[in-house]
Amino acid sequence: MSVRDIRLLGDPVLRTVADPVATFDRELRRLVDDLADTMRDAGGVGLAAPQLGVSLRIFTYLDDSDEVGHLINPVLGPFSEEMMDGEEGCLSLPGLAFDLRRPERVLAVGQNSHGDPVTVEGSGILSRCLQHETDHLDGILFIDRLDKETKRAAMKAIREAEWSNEPKPAVKVSPHPLFGRGR
């Protein structure tokens, strides 16, 4: 178990559709542990494997009781018709957050690190997290879902961000400047 570097916007792995997990072994469980350690260290509420440079369909999240959970090969749906507005950030875009509308509730099904079936019902922040992290597995970043005006502001903020001109698109973000340490 270790804390790894978090990939930043600009790293091609963040725009790649991640591969399904087929082998549930010790190496996979080590990756899940590293995701959890890195997420906690960075003060995030979710972290997907592509954010560590690993193109596999895995993410970790903090549940409503602040416990770390994980989903492998997740599928989302159904989504509630009720929507929620709220500020959303990302460990791969440190220090930035923008208002984004998402469904209030979602059901997520997938597997745990042993290959057993898992179902997670999320509402509020957990729903937002499940949707955000699944987007990462599909090569989608939350800024892709912003309305036109907010996206313009986001692009300006990204260009002005200290990390956007880094020569390497990976940096250890610990703790995340927006969320602080822990939740």
UniProtKB/Swiss-Prot annotation:
Any single biological process term in GO: co-translational protein modification
Protein name: Peptide deformylase
GO molecular function, one term: peptide deformylase activity
Lineage: Bacteria, Bacillati, Actinomycetota, Actinomycetes, Frankiales
Family of the protein in this entry: Belongs to the polypeptide deformylase family.
Top-level enzyme category: hydrolase
Gene3D superfamilies: Peptide deformylase
Free-text function comment from the UniProt entry: Removes the formyl group from the N-terminal Met of newly synthesized proteins. Requires at least a dipeptide for an efficient rate of reaction. N-terminal L-methionine is a prerequisite for activity but the enzyme has broad specificity at other positions.
Short name of one Pfam family: Pep_deformylase
Gene: def
Entry annotation: catalytic residues: 133
